[in-house]
A protein has these predicted regions:
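Small-residue-rich helix-loop
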Residues: 10-113
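Short, hydrophobic/amphipathic alpha-helical patches that form generic packing surfaces
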Residues: 1-4, 43-46, 123-127
Length: 165
C-alpha cells in the first residue's frame, strides 16, 4: 500500500492494518494501542512497514540511544544537562499534559533559557523518543503521558550527566 492510500484511510482502518507490522517486530499491540498514534504518523508514512521505526519508542520501556544525541546544537553536554533539568521541572509542574497546553510554557522556557526552539526541543525529543526525528513533539509527549516523559527525562539526565563530567 502506498502513501496515497495510507493518507486516505480512516484512523481505525489504518490502526488495524499496522498491527501485523508491529507484531512482526515483536511488539504485542492492538489496534486500540495504535489508534492515538496513527494521526501523528499517517501523513509521514510512505509504506506500512515504516511504522515500526517511526513508533517503536511508544512501546519500549527502555530507550537505547547514544548519549551524544542529547547534546543540543552548538551546546556543551553541561549546558544541555542544565537545560534538560529545567525542562523536566517545567514538565513536572504542568497541571495537565495536553499538547495544546504544553507548547506555550515550553516556548516560554526556550526564551527564558536564551535558546532557539530547535535546540531545546531537539534535546527533549531525543530524551522522550530516543530519536532525532520523531512525530510532532508535544503530540508525542501527550500520547506517552506525563509520567513516562518524566521517567525518560530522568534517564536522559543520567546519560547527559555522564557526558558532562
Amino acid at each position: 500500500m502506498n502513501c496515497y492510500y495510507i493518507r486516505h484511510l480512516d484512523t481505525d482502518s489504518l490502526a488495524q492494518q499496522l498491527v501485523p507490522f508491529m507484531a512482526q517486530s515483536g511488539f504485542d499491540v492492538t489496534a486500540a494501542d495504535m489508534r492515538p498514534i496513527v494521526p501523528l504518523v499517517q501523513e509521514r508514512l510512505k509504506t506500512l512497514s515504516e511504522i515500526v521505526e517511526r513508533t517503536d519508542f511508544f512501546f519500549q520501556d527502555q530507550l537505547d540511544y547514544d548519549a551524544v544525541l542529547l547534546v543540543g546544537k552548538k551546546m556543551s553536554a553541561a549546558e544541555s544537562l542544565a537545560d534538560l533539568l529545567r525542562t523536566r521541572e517545567a514538565l513536572a509542574a504542568l497541571p495537565t499534559f495536553e499538547a495544546v497546553l504544553m507548547e506555550t510554557p515550553m516556548r516560554d522556557l526556550v526564551a527564558e533559557l536564551g535558546l532557539k526552539a530547535g535546540q531545546l526541543f531537539g534535546i527533549v525529543r531525543v530524551a522522550v523518543t530516543g530519536k532525532k526525528v520523531a512525530p510532532p513533539l508535544f503530540d508525542t509527549m501527550e500520547v506517552l503521558g506525563q509520567s513516562r516523559c518524566l521517567e525518560r527525562a530522568d534517564r536522559a539526565i543520567e546519560k547527559l550527566a555522564s557526558l558532562a563530567l
